[in-house]
From Swiss-Prot:
Chain residue ranges for the region called Involved in Mg(2+) ion dislocation from EF-Tu: 82-85
Protein known as: Elongation factor Ts
Family under the similarity heading: Belongs to the EF-Ts family.
SUPFAM superfamilies, alphabetized: Elongation factor Ts (EF-Ts), dimerisation domain (SSF54713), UBA-like (SSF46934)
UniProt entry keywords in alphabetical sequence: Cytoplasm, Elongation factor, Protein biosynthesis
Primary localisation category: cytoplasm
Location within or outside the cell: Cytoplasm
GO function term, MF aspect, one: translation elongation factor activity
A cellular component term, taken from the record's GO annotations: cytoplasm
Domain of life: Bacteria
HAMAP family per the UniProt record, alphabetical: EF_Ts
Functional summary from the UniProt entry: Associates with the EF-Tu.GDP complex and induces the exchange of GDP to GTP. It remains bound to the aminoacyl-tRNA.EF-Tu.GTP complex up to the GTP hydrolysis stage on the ribosome.
Length: 290
C-alpha cells in the first residue's frame, strides 16, 4: 500500500477544494493514487449533488454576451442558494463557461448546453462549495441590432433588439429596461387577460361607487390608457431624459424597438420559509435514521 503523504493530501485538496480528512480518506481508499482518488471523489460528488437537489436555489447571477457585430446575444441565469456563493470566483467562472457555450452554439436548451463537461463541472462545484447550483434559463435574441446590459451586481440582465440604430442606442434602451422593468414593448402586446384583470381592479376601487355606469366606463378607459402607457416600453419616459419617451429616443437614433428580454435573479422562484427550530429538529431526526 502506497503511503499517503502530506504532500499528496495537499495536492488533492488544491485540485478538489475538499477538506483534509476527506482527501486523506480518499487517498487511503485509492492506495495513494491521486488520479484514482479524484475519480472516486467524482463518483461521490454525483451523490452529494443529488442530495442537495431538494434545496431551493433562488440566489445567483445573470450574465449577457453580445456578438461583436451586434447581430445576436444570449442572456443566462445561474442560481445558487446564497449571495455569498454568487460572488465566489469559481462560481462566476462556471457561469462564464455556460455563457460562452450557449453563445457559441446559439443554444437556449439548458440540457443541451449542460451536456458533457459543463455538467461535470457543475457537480464538482456543488461538491466544493456545498450548495445547490443550477442553470435556470438561457435566452437568445437574434436579428437587427442587439444590445445588452447587466445591472445591480449581476442581478438583472437585459437584451434589446432594434430595427436600425446602433449599439449605443440598444445599450441605452437596455439600461432603461433594467431600471424601469416594462411589461411589454408596446400597448398592443399586453395580454387581454391582464387588461381585463386591471379593469376589475379599477371597478372595485372606492371612488367608483355610486357613479353612473357610463361615467365608470369612461374612467376605466382613461385609467387603462394610463396603465398601458406606464407598462409599455416605448411609451415610458426615457430614464436618461424623461422629457422624451423611449420611442422618441430610439427614433432620434434611427431605431425602432422590436423586442427585449429581461432576467432578474430568482424572479418567480418560491422560497419556503422554514422555522429554524423545526429545521434543526428535522436534521436531527434525519441523522438518527441514517
Amino acid at each position: 500500500m502506497s503511503a499517503v503523504t502530506p504532500a499528496l493530501v495537499k495536492e488533492l485538496r488544491d485540485r478538489t477544494g475538499l477538506g483534509m480528512m476527506e482527501c486523506k480518506k480518499a487517498l487511503g481508499d485509492a492506495n495513494g493514487d491521486i488520479e484514482l482518488a479524484i475519480e472516486n471523489l467524482r463518483k461521490v460528488s454525483g451523490l452529494k449533488a443529488a442530495k442537495k437537489e431538494g434545496r431551493t436555489a433562488a440566489d445567483g447571477v445573470v450574465a449577457v454576451k453580445v456578438a461583436a457585430d451586434n447581430s445576436y446575444g444570449v442572456a443566462v441565469e445561474v442560481n445558487s442558494e446564497t449571495d455569498f456563493v454568487a460572488r465566489d470566483a469559481g462560481f462566476l467562472a462556471f457561469v462564464n463557461s455556460v455563457v460562452e457555450k450557449a453563445f457559441a452554439a446559439k443554444q437556449t436548451d439548458v440540457a443541451a448546453v449542460m451536456a458533457g463537461e459543463l455538467e461535470i463541472a457543475r457537480e464538482a462545484l456543488v461538491q466544493k462549495i456545498g450548495e445547490k447550483i443550477s442553470v435556470r434559463r438561457i435566452n437568445l435574441v437574434e436579428g437587427g441590432v442587439v444590445g445588452g446590459y447587466v445591472h445591480l451586481n449581476n442581478r438583472i440582465a437585459v437584451l434589446v433588439q432594434l430595427e436600425g440604430g446602433s449599439e449605443d442606442v440598444a445599450k441605452d434602451v437596455a439600461m432603461h429596461v433594467a431600471a424601469v422593468n416594462p411589461q411589454v414593448v408596446s400597448a398592443d402586446q399586453m395580454p387581454a387577460d391582464v387588461v381585463e384583470k386591471e379593469k376589475e381592479i379599477i371597478r372595485a376601487q372606492p371612488d367608483m361607487a355610486g357613479k353612473p355606469a357610463e361615467i365608470v366606463e369612461k374612467m376605466i378607459v382613461g385609467r387603462i390608457s394610463k396603465f398601458l402607457k406606464e407598462a409599455s416600453l416605448v411609451d415610458q419616459p426615457f430614464v436618461k431624459n424623461p422629457e422624451q419617451t423611449v420611442a422618441q429616443f430610439a427614433k432620434a437614433g434611427g431605431a425602432t424597438v422590436k423586442s427585449f428580454v429581461r432576467l432578474e435573479v430568482g424572479e418567480g422562484i418560491e422560497v419556503a420559509v422554514v422555522d429554524f427550530a423545526a429545521e434543526v429538529a428535522a436534521q436531527v431526526a434525519a441523522s438518527a435514521k441514517s
